[in-house]
From Swiss-Prot:
Swiss-Prot/TrEMBL catalytic activity: S-adenosyl 3-(methylsulfanyl)propylamine + putrescine = S-methyl-5'-thioadenosine + spermidine + H(+)
Coiled-coil stretches noted in the UniProt entry, renumbered to this chain: none
Name of the molecule in the record: Polyamine aminopropyltransferase
Subunit structure, as described in the record: Homodimer or homotetramer.
Entries under InterPro entries matching the protein: PABS, PABS_CS, SAM-dependent_MTases_sf, Spermi_synthase, Spermidine_synt_N, Spermidine_synt_N_sf
UniProt-annotated location(s): Cytoplasm
Keywords: Cytoplasm, Polyamine biosynthesis, Spermidine biosynthesis, Transferase
Cellular component aspect of the GO annotation: cytosol
CDD domains, alphabetized: AdoMet_MTases
Family named by the database record: Belongs to the spermidine/spermine synthase family.
């Protein structure tokens, strides 16, 4: 009996391969090629344009680290925006913070939202929560129209290809600063230091010119290229490394802890060299 294997070609010379039980859905949306597959090792997985976006097995790492680092850094996050993130995982984590009154999700591709609800219910299950406002719209344009509106903005985008290209520009980061309140914080995924070191260097440079507090932190995500993933955080006022212990409270997580919050900012030398 033949086996089906799916390979994501992460660079010209490197990729990740996984055994597939069956294809759940495949579609060319208005913006990208969407695939939902059931894999033997990582459960149901979402691919966009052939790239792993999330899997049932390891999704918690990414979503917890995008959400909880800025939300514990800010003393009272009430209004939060997620740009991208149509799978709903970041929203699920945001709603674990009782201070949050409203979480807005803006994703350009409604099909990602639709099929995440269908095939990734453990990830997308909170998208229908009454505190959540889901908008199928261009995140770049949404930011451009917003001013002094959000406490925290999280950019949960794909890699800088296709519809996400504009989400890695200095103009976009300037728009985020305008959309944030005077003590606002933002975080964005910024890929990995093994295959895209220039991206990290460029994003950090641009964000540092806009936000007085700019830092890089990492997490280990098996299905993402190289397994070592980075996040850039920009803050107008609050330092993520100066959060008092009394501010941390217990939430249900699998990866994020008070100690991980601090340890994530300890970088290997070759990574810290990228942002000097």
């Amino acid at each position: 009996m033949s086996e089906l294997w799916y390979t994501e070609k992460q660079t010209k010379n490197f990729g990740i391969t996984m055994k597939v039980n069956k294809t759940l859905h495949t579609e060319q949306t208005e913006f990208q090629h969407l695939e939902m597959v059931e894999t033997e090792e990582f459960g149901n997985m979402l691919f966009l344009d052939g790239m792993v976006m999330t899997s049932e097995k390891d999704e918690f790492v990414y979503h917890e680290m995008v959400a909880h680092v800025p939300l514990f850094t800010h003393p009272n996050p009430e209004h939060v925006l997620v740009v991208g993130g149509g799978d709903g995982g970041v929203i699920r984590e945001i709603l674990k913070h009782p201070s949050v009154k409203k979480a807005t999700l803006v994703d350009i591709d409604g099909k990602v939202i639709e099929y995440s609800k269908k095939f990734l219910p453990s990830i997308a299950g909170k998208l229908d929560d009454p505190r959540v406002d889901v908008q199928v719209d261009d995140g770049f344009m949404h930011i451009a129209k917003s001013e002094n509106q959000y406490d925290v903005i999280m950019v949960d985008s794909t890699e800088p290809v296709g519809p996400a290209v504009n989400l890695f520009t200095k103009g976009f980061y300037a728009g985020i600063a305008k959309a944030l309140k005077e003590d606002g914080i933002f975080v964005a995924q910024t890929d990995n230091p093994w295959f895209t070191p220039e991206l990290i260097t460029n994003v950090q440079r641009d964000v540092k010119e806009i936000f007085p507090i700019t830092k890089l932190y990492t997490a280990n995500i098996p299905t993402y290229p190289s397994g070592l993933w980075t996040f850039t955080i920009g803050s107008k006022k609050y330092d993520p490394l100066a959060v008092e212990d009394s501010r941390f409270f217990d939430i249900e997580t699998k990866y994020y802890t008070k100690d991980i919050h601090k340890a994530a900012f300890v970088l290997p030398k070759f990574v810290s060299d990228l942002i000097k």
